[in-house]
């Protein structure tokens, strides 16, 4: 999975010149970082998506010499929920994973705020279901990396949109806007 984003201004989706405005998943989050499916290195989605979180977790398991409650979970069964449960159970590798992910995501959100100054940012998807494990370090990093004039002014919150409705509602909104 990747990391999608959209920018809503005055209730309308910002499309840009060719319909691809708001590709936050492909901003450079880590110089010379992980290879992304788009061909670039260090894209935000290689760190802040469900797959990125899995990769960070495996790096943390290696760093902490396999001292993890989920270290033996097969890659095909490893997901954000398994890592979340491990973090809540006190797993140091899983907790570090959320801290690192939140730091990177928060820094990129701060950059986005600097050039767009939104009133709110809504996060959505599997990793966001972990709640404060991801939201607290993300918010802390975002605020730390903001210029003082922007601090404590942008709401960062999980979307309340049901996961099962997201794709159809997004597609419907695009059709309605074209009518």
Explain the meaning of each model-derived region.
Residues 1-2, 20, 126:
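A short acidic Gly-Thr/Ser loop motif
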Residues 20-32:
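A short, polar/charged loop-to-alpha-helix boundary motif
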Residues 4-8:
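Short beta-strand scaffold segments in enzyme catalytic cores
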Residues 13, 31-35, 40-179:
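ATP-binding/phosphotransfer module of carbohydrate and carboxylate kinases, centering on a glycine-rich
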